[in-house]
């Protein structure tokens, strides 16, 4: 999506702040969900899209027009379109993927545009690694 949209809208800067993480669920379902958010971001952005990814959340924001506060969460229902939207299915698909994998999605206005956040209420438990090595003088931890 980013590469295709960059050809169509080269004036949009894509800013990334991404950690290597693993979200629960099927990779294809997440690809479709993220593509839907990114397509919307490219449709409405004025000059930039920012993608941030951490262990338990993902945020895609842009500097496009703000959404009416009373309509933001309704955009996750099927056939609900924002101004300039196409079919009203993209964010509904995002919502279904999130729910199926125990994540939450929300949209909100930001200081300079709109952002969509996917997150978990409960953080994933990380397993402790055994036999880790400290790179301090080659000593074993």
Regions found by a protein language model. Give the residues of each.
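Short alpha-helical Gxxx[C/S/T] motif in the catalytic ATP-binding
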Residues: 90, 94
